[in-house]
């Protein structure tokens, strides 16, 4: 036989629960921790030209977000890669996601492209800056994961195609330019230089993408005939003439080791910030290690 339950308010926010003829327990609602906590909304100040690091870890880091960053230019953002939970992370930093519609997709590995799939499922329009071969790989992956047709995907993903060594003005920007090249990785992977130029003001931010920068190994592969002289020169160059250089520093045999960068001159080291971190920063490092959520301004 089921007992009848009676709930009686004995005073404001205090209730007795009575089962049958016996009082079972008392509930004080004002003693229950409220889930409605007051959150002070973060105010994020966007640099006119600079970067914010969304994440700085490798795909195997346990204590860092996967590597992704925003290049800010003309009060708008360009994501370099877009990681899982991107929109949630941006919100936690106080960043308005509506100010960021462009994504440079370096390559198709899940620690770099998961957020693009999420945007697609949320029907958020994305301008995808990448090469044709990387874009075609993205389409195949997106179709396999979502069962959407190419036509449906392209309702929300617009390709801005880039070709190695051809500088373009980024659509939607007035004085911001993008230059693409391929890095050295296990699959086709891009790197870039983003330039703001107006009058006498010119600043460049470069990004290595995932890459194996290792001069002795590249020399060996060249000697074996794996590269042309031009390709070798490109692999060892392209990014170093920037005002801010963002470089891969680990996560496997096809990534750059810290020691492979030590030959760089002092001026270049001072301009270089390390991401895709797979290990703890070196003690007394000659380079700056980026931090999740950090912003660097070149033009305020």
Where are the regions a protein language model picked out?
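Active-site flanking residues adjacent to catalytic metal/cofactor-binding acidic residues
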Residues: 80, 106, 207-210, 247, ...
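Cap/insert and terminal regions of metallo-dependent hydrolase folds
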Residues: 1, 214-300
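Active-site metal-binding motif and surrounding structural segment of the metallo-beta-lactamase
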Residues: 77, 84-133, 236-246
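Short internal beta-strands
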Residues: 126-137, 271-276
């Amino acid at each position: 036989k089921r007992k009848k339950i009676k709930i009686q308010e004995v005073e404001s926010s205090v209730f007795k629960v009575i089962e049958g003829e016996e009082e079972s327990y008392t509930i004080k609602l004002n003693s229950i921790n409220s889930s409605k906590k007051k959150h002070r909304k973060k105010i994020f100040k966007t640099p006119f030209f600079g970067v914010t690091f969304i994440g700085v870890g490798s795909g195997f880091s346990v204590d860092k977000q996967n590597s992704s960053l925003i290049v800010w230019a003309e009060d708008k953002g360009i994501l370099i890669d877009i990681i899982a939970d991107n929109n949630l992370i941006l919100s936690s930093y106080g960043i308005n996601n509506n100010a960021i519609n462009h994504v440079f997709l370096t390559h198709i590995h899940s620690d770099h492209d998961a957020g693009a799939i999420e945007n697609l499922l949320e029907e958020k329009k994305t301008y995808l800056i990448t090469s044709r071969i990387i874009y075609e790989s993205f389409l195949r992956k997106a179709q396999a994961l979502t069962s959407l047709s190419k036509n449906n995907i392209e309702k929300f993903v617009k390709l801005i195609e880039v070709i190695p060594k051809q500088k373009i003005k980024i659509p939607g920007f007035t004085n911001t330019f993008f230059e693409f090249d391929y890095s050295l990785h296990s699959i086709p992977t891009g790197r870039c230089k983003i330039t703001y130029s107006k009058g006498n003001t010119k600043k460049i931010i470069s990004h290595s993408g995932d890459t194996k920068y290792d001069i002795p190994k590249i020399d060996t592969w060249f000697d074996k005939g794996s590269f042309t002289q031009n390709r070798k020169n490109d692999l060892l160059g392209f990014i170093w003439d920037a005002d801010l250089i963002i470089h891969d520093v680990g996560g496997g045999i096809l990534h750059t080791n810290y020691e492979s960068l030590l030959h760089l001159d002092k001026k270049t080291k001072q301009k270089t910030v390390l991401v895709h971190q797979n290990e703890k920063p070196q003690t007394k490092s000659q380079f700056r290690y980026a931090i999740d959520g950090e912003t660097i301004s070149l033009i305020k």
